[in-house]
């Protein structure tokens, strides 16, 4: 018995390991794993169902079918354990050994492993320096390969077909050795002398000049070094022994009706054994060569199919015409071993049910049906029943529970007390998709969920289901209570704002109770205190909305914790006074003395959390909810068709718009505007009309007339139900009301372009058939989008999580003083995000000085909280350098200072926080949310009217930034640069707003001029792009030949002509090379030169330009000589958004990216080549000129002789992040990517903290490219991990050797995930075969540093409480002690974490 216990003890204990190595298996190793050779293809006997001897299920090899019982039944029972039966040869053991014992097949002829052959790049091919085609011809017996040329003229590795082989035989006899098949390949691999080859390659690489050759050689060198360093031998890539999987992992199960269900692997193994046995027989018979050859080829194909079916040739199919599932298919893909069984396991002690509302629950509770609780907590109930002495055995306890006796319910209630359960709703898009609650037993079968956590779960009650999980161990319960309790997750990890915010009915109730009405009952009364207000209201003497005065006692807590009490009389309403009763002490009365819209409530909860702490906030949130529900019931708000009041002005607005459209149509008919311009103008008109209608409608809805106390008629805010719902933020938006009571507006076609005719009707009036038909486009597109985008967004999240999963906070401070420069984010002239918001929760990297002085006002190392933000804004600081995850110098992780505040807790981030996963979830979660919300506006085209002027919002001084301008005859300036900006500064010199000025903008103010608020300071035509002259003179046309480079369009109706430049593709052959241009000459016909240069003033005209001047016309400075029509606009919808985010994270090079200057210097144009222009930049520092060929159709922003700085835009287009990184550095790249991604999310009103994007970006910048190898072992052009290179350089510097130099490389998230250190993580992500092949050949070690690897091997993850476990393991291992972390240690660690979070 003792032995048995020891045995059981050893079963569960896995020996300690720190890394997992993967390599090639040698034939000896395969034989050492094996318990015997499988010689026959038989599986089980069809009559006795017993496994056949020496077959694929043989009990002698793999172990007994029944526990402790040999096959013939001679030895049964535990006492014979370990005996080998002399009759049937089976060892008496547990049947479980059939899951772990392997066997082998001795192959009659070697077989190449298909992974190393076909998985690109082919490892066998690289090593032998032969092409894949050639090797395949040898392997599949089409050609001979020379193994040993001897003294002949043949070369080693040369391929010979049959004819050549027989000729050679005749010529040289036996002097040479040429063979075919895998044994030939094996011989060649065996003959490779790795050391000699490595030396040769290392000498050869520096001597070659061709890039491609260097690449090829360094690939070979890498592979050889990998083989040499890993202890793998090249010939092991060819199998001589094939391992056989244990039988219980490829089961054969009898079904009823005498049929069998079997794993496909058995079929594949059977084929291999059959062919192998046949080959052995043929060899024994010394059959003709051609037959043996064929059999060998078939054996090779059978093994290929077993390892990876379908990788070469047609996949082998089973009886049902489906391809058989091979070993490779078992591990890859969503249904493979990694993703299905190792990373995504099913969990016991769980259940699921439909959810309903639990409006009476407290925030930390959930309603759990008794039935479910009884099932989930069974073991606990059994234990309690026994302990109480109500049941003598577990069996008796079971019976009691089945009968559901009354005492069982009492015990259940006791068991459940303070035992949290986890509730999860799929899809779990962020960590708030699983939270812990204390269960409350309820009747019925549905789980009750607290309304305030619905936002976090994205749950509604239209049939959603949720799963319940029971944390069993004490540690698990502790973690659930301390870390996952819903009351501990009030703030969203994505942006640090409250996520437990009332919505819908609750908001409506609170809004209704805090509104004021004129001349309500009790108006003007004065009350002594809140209690009196309450009494009078209950007695019905004062209405809820009555304006009153009341004396209040408020306690105000300052940020520094000092408490001041004061008593004052406030003007307020009855409802607000009642609401103040539930507000915790410490908040001023002003927080409720306003109509409580959703934003205000959110702000209130946030303020409450920051001022009075977590506990009070939770109680307060609950009270708010109860109050809100109560008053929304009292309000009796409902919707009727009469609530949709259609404004009287609607008809007038629509008529005038229709007239204007007719006017434009007639202009088009008379040729004054082009089709594109007409389209743009019409759409602008209707957009404006739509806005006007909705303004009129809202104005109409939002006001109502009432009689005040004096009997006069006055206006007050309306109590229209629909208006209240929208205004409070409970449901609906102005855009939706506009469709109900205004007009539906413009619709989009399925391709995204806008239909010119709008829908002028609204839903109250009803749509005509045509209007209904037009609107179906948009609606249908919305639904189709939703389905597609959900999948895309989920995939984006998966890639993000994968790239960032191993990023954990591992130390407090890495000590760097690098950081990112933070400035306010300005868009369209407005400050979208002030500096304060951007630096909140960050650590200052370098001291911040008071503007204009040397006084340090914010020292480096400060964690900026709300108080500091106020301070920074008071001191009008414009820029701050803050620490960022991108610049963090911690290896294998990130430091707390560079990350800053843990957004979900509101203090500095704890060590062990998995910030990578949090970042990935924060970015991925709204992606899904947004894509699920495309169709809420019913596809109505929300296109903004194009901006055509700059109107300043604040008065102040004009500042012009890097603007080139010319002065027109009328004194106005015209911008002739593209990156110019106009800013307005206030009297302190702080910039209040900033606008981009497009090329050709007419500016009516000068630098330093004072302007009033509301002044229009610049104008331009938004629909065309002008070409402006910079000097005065006469126009001459160059290369403008009719119907060759230009076409004159004469409008049939008007007889007016305009000149349009033809696109190169539309020109006849004669015109392909001609570049039409407009040249400026003086009165004598001499060339004029651009101001300050010796470059002739010649303006090249791009395709489709419309020329607006005649040949020989006189023009002045700043006049427009040609216009380029702009593209018509498509609606910007997150549909464009999600792919945009994916493109940015995948670091894809955009099509026709903008061209940046590679060096700083002076621009010149060299000799042109076919279809390309030669751009030459002469550097300012006197080094060699830089040349670049640019396609002629690219529109250049620079003129000859202009000065450019490195990284400046030469030709417009979407930016290429790789160029930004190369030319402008990491900070510029970070700024670009963060801003671009934020723009997409901001468009949808989603807030994500910048640091999440930076965290992902850090992972994308992990790799560097070696530019000079110095004394290191790196090869130039290699991609290495940054940490590796830094460690190596430190070592070299310590030995006074030359360090290697490198440049940073930006990898897309997919590529970064696949090139991670850990092969387990990469293999479980994508391209499993390729990753494992590469890892095996190089003999990779996985040090299990990330989260994923540890989940796969079944350990605690090295994050959170698991980090303590791992560091303790490491400490113990260093001290060499047995390891066990006790519950008390975990508890201590948790308490510490909680204490720090409580502060």
Curated annotation (Swiss-Prot):
- The membrane-spanning stretches of this chain are none
For this UniProt entry, the molecular function terms from Gene Ontology, in alphabetical order, are: DNA binding; DNA-directed RNA polymerase activity; magnesium ion binding; zinc ion binding
* Keyword Transferase attached: yes
Which residues take part in binding Zn(2+) 2?
A: 814, 888, 895, 898
Enzyme nomenclature, EC number: 2.7.7.6
Catalytic activity reads: RNA(n) + a ribonucleoside 5'-triphosphate = RNA(n+1) + diphosphate
Q: Has the keyword Zinc been applied to this entry?
A: yes
> How, per the record, is the cofactor bound?
Binds 1 Mg(2+) ion per subunit. Binds 2 Zn(2+) ions per subunit.
Q: Could you tell me the Gene Ontology terms of the biological process aspect for this record?
A: DNA-templated transcription
Residues bound to Zn(2+) 1 are: 70, 72, 85, 88
- Check the record and name the SMART domains matching this protein: RPOLA_N (SM00663)
UniProt keywords, alphabetically? DNA-directed RNA polymerase, Magnesium, Metal-binding, Nucleotidyltransferase, Transcription, Transferase, Zinc
Residues the entry annotates as binding Mg(2+) = 460, 462, 464
Pfam families membership: RNA_pol_Rpb1_1 (PF04997), RNA_pol_Rpb1_2 (PF00623), RNA_pol_Rpb1_3 (PF04983), RNA_pol_Rpb1_4 (PF05000), RNA_pol_Rpb1_5 (PF04998)
Report the enzyme's class at the first EC level. Answer: transferase
Described by its record, this protein's role is as follows: DNA-dependent RNA polymerase catalyzes the transcription of DNA into RNA using the four ribonucleoside triphosphates as substrates.
Family, similarity comment:
Belongs to the RNA polymerase beta' chain family.
Q: How does it assemble?
A: The RNAP catalytic core consists of 2 alpha, 1 beta, 1 beta' and 1 omega subunit. When a sigma factor is associated with the core the holoenzyme is formed, which can initiate transcription.
- Could you tell me which NCBIfam families the record lists for this protein? rpoC_TIGR
Identification of the protein by name: DNA-directed RNA polymerase subunit beta'
The record lists the organism as Pseudomonas putida (strain GB-1)
Q: What is the lineage of its organism?
A: Bacteria, Pseudomonadati, Pseudomonadota, Gammaproteobacteria, Pseudomonadales
């Amino acid at each position: 018995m003792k032995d048995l216990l020891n045995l059981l003890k050893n079963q569960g204990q896995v020996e300690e390991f720190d890394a997992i190595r993967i390599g090639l298996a040698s034939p000896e190793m395969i034989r050492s794993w094996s318990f015997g050779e499988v010689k026959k293809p038989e599986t089980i006997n069809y009559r006795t169902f017993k496994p056949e001897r020496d077959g694929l299920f043989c009990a002698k090899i793999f172990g007994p079918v029944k526990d402790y019982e040999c096959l013939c039944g001679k030895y049964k029972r535990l006492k014979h354990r370990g005996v080998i039966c002399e009759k049937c040869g089976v060892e008496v053991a547990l049947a479980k050994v059939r899951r772990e014992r392997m066997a082998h097949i001795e192959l009659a002829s070697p077989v190449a492993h298909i992974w190393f052959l076909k998985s690109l790049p082919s490892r066998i091919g690289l090593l032998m320096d032969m092409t894949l085609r050639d090797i395949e011809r040898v392997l599949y017996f089409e050609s001979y390969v020379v193994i040993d040329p001897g003294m002949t003229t043949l070369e080693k590795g040369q391929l010979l077909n049959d004819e050549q082989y027989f000729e050679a035989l005749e010529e040289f006899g036996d002097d040479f050795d040429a063979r075919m098949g895998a044994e030939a390949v094996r011989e060649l691999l065996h003959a490779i002398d790795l050391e000699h080859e490595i030396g040769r390659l290392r000498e050869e690489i520096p001597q070659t000049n061709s890039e491609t050759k260097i690449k090829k050689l360094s690939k070979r060198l890498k592979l050889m070094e990998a083989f040499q360093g890993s202890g793998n031998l090249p010939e092991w890539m060819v199998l001589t022994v094939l391992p056989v999987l244990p039988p219980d992992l490829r089961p054969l199960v009898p079904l009823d009706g005498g049929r069998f269900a079997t794993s496909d692997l058995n079929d594949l193994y059977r084929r291999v054994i059959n062919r192998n046995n046949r080959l052995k027989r043929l060899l024994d018979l010394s059959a003709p060569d051609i037959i043996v050859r064929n059999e060998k080829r078939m054996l090779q194909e059978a093994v290929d199919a077993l390892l990876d079916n379908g990788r070469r040739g047609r996949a082998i199919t089973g009886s049902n015409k489906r391809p058989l599932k091979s070993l490779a298919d078992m591990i890859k893909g969503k249904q493979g071993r990694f993703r299905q069984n190792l990373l995504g396991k099913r969990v016991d002690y769980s259940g699921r049910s439909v959810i309903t509302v639990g409006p009476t629950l407290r925030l930390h509770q959930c309603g759990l049906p008794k039935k479910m609780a009884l099932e989930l907590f069974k073991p606990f109930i059994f234990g309690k029943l026994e302990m109480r002495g109500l049941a003598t055995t577990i069996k008796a306890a079971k019976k009691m529970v089945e009968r559901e006796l009354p005492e069982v319910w009492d015990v259940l209630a006791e068991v459940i007390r303070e035992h949290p359960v986890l509730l999860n709703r799929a899809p779990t898009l962020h960590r708030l998709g699983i939270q812990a609650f204390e269960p409350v037993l309820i009747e019925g079968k549905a789980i009750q969920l607290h309304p305030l956590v619905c936002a976090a779960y994205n749950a509604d009650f239209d049939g959603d289901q949720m799963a319940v999980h029971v944390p069993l161990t004490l540690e698990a319960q502790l973690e659930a209570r301390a870390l996952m309790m819903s009351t501990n997750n009030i703030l969203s990890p994505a942006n640090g704002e409250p996520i437990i915010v009332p919505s819908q009915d609750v908001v409506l109730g609170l809004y209704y109770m805090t509104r004021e009405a004129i001349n309500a009952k009790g108006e003007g009364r004065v009350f002594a205190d809140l209690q009196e207000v309450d009494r009078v209201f209950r007695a019905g003497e004062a209405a809820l909305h009555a304006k009153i005065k009341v004396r209040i006692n408020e306690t105000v807590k300052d940020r520094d914790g000092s408490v001041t009490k004061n008593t004052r009389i406030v003007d307020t309403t009855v409802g607000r006074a009642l609401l103040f009763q539930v507000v915790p002490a410490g908040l001023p009365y002003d927080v409720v003395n306003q109509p409580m819209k959703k934003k205000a409530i959110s702000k209130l909860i946030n303020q409450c959390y920051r001022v009075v702490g977590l506990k009070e906030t939770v109680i307060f949130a609950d009270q708010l909810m109860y109050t809100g529900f109560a008053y929304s019931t009292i309000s009796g708000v409902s919707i009727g068709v009469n609530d949709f009041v259609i404004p009287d002005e609607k008809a007038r607005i629509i008529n005038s718009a229709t007239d204007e459209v007719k006017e434009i149509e007639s202009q088009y008919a008379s040729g004054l505007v082009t089709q594109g311009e007409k389209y743009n103008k019409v759409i602008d008109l209707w957009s404006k009309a739509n806005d006007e209608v909705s303004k009129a409608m809202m104005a109409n809805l939002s006001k109502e007339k009432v009689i005040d106390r004096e009997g006069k008629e006055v206006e007050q805010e309306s109590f229209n139900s629909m208006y209240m719902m929208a205004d409070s933020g409970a449901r609906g938006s102005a855009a939706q009301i506009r469709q109900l009571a205004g007009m539906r507006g413009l619709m989009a076609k399925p391709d995204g372009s806008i239909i010119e005719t709008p829908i002028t009707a609204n839903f109250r009036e009803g749509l005509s058939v045509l209007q209904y038909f037009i609107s179906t486009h948009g609606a249908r597109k919305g639904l189709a989008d939703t389905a597609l985008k959900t999948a895309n967004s989920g995939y984006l999240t998966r890639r993000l999580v994968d790239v960032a999963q191993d990023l954990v906070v591992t130390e407090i401070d890495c000590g760097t003083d690098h950081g990112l420069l933070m400035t306010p984010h300005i868009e369209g002239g407005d400050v979208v995000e002030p500096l304060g918001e951007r630096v909140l929760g960050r650590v200052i990297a370098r001291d911040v000085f008071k503007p204009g002085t040397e006084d340090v006002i914010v020292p480096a190392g400060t964690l900026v909280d709300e108080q500091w933000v106020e301070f920074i804004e008071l001191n009008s600081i414009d820029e701050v350098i803050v620490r960022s995850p991108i610049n963090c110098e911690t290896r294998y992780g990130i430091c707390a200072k560079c990350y800053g505040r843990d957004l979900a807790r509101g203090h500095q981030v704890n060590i062990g926080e998995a910030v990578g996963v949090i970042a990935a979830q924060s970015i991925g979660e709204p992606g899904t949310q947004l894509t699920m919300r495309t169709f809420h506006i019913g596809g109505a085209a929300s296109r903004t009217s194009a901006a055509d002027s700059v109107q300043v919002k604040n008065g102040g001084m004009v500042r012009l930034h890097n603007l080139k301008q010319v002065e027109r005859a009328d004194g106005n300036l015209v911008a002739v640069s593209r990156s110019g900006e106009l800013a307005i500064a206030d009297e302190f010199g702080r910039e209040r707003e900033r606008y981009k000025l497009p090329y050709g903008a007419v500016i009516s103010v000068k630098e330093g001029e004072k302007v009033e608020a509301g002044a229009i300071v610049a104008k331009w035509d938004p629909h065309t792009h002008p070409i402006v002259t910079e000097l005065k003179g006469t126009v001459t046309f160059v290369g403008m030949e009719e119907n060759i480079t230009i076409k004159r369009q004469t409008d049939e109706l008007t007889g007016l002509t305009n000149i349009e430049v033809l696109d190169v593709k539309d020109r006849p052959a004669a015109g392909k090379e001609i570049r039409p241009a407009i040249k400026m000459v003086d009165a004598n016909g001499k060339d004029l030169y651009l101001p300050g240069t010796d470059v002739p003033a010649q303006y090249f005209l791009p395709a489709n330009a419309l020329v607006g001047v005649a040949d020989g016309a006189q023009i002045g400075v700043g006049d427009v000589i040609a216009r380029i029509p702009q593209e018509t606009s498509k609606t910007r919808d997150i549909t464009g958004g999600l792919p945009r985010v994916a493109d940015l994270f995948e670091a894809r090079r955009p099509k026709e990216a903008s061209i940046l200057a590679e060096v700083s210097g002076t621009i010149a144009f060299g000799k042109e080549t076919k279809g390309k222009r030669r751009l030459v930049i002469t550097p300012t520092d006197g080094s060699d000129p830089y040349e670049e060929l640019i396609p002629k159709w690219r529109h250049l922003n620079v003129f000859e002789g202009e000065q450019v700085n490195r990284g400046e835009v030469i030709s417009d287009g979407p930016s290429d992040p790789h160029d930004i990184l190369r030319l402008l550095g990491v900070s510029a790249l970070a700024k670009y990517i963060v801003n671009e991604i934020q723009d997409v999310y901001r468009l949808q009103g989603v807030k994500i903290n910048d640091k999440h994007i930076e965290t992902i970006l850090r992972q994308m910048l992990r790799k560097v490219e070696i530019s000079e190898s110095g004394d290191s072992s790196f090869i130039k052009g290699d991609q290495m991990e940054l940490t590796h290179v830094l460690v190596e350089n430190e070592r070299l510097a310590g030995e006074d050797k030359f360090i290697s130099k490198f440049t940073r490389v930006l990898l897309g998230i997919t590529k970064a995930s696949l090139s991670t250190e850990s092969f387990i993580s990469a293999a479980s992500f994508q391209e499993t075969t390729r990753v494992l092949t590469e890892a095996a050949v190089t003999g990779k070690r996985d040090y299990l540093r990330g989260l994923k690897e540890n989940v796969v091997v079944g350990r605690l993850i090295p994050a959170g409480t698991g980090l303590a476990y791992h560091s303790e393991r490491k400490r113990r291992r260093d001290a060499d002690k047995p390891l066990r972390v006790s519950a008390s240690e975990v508890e201590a660690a948790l308490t510490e974490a909680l204490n720090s979070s409580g502060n």
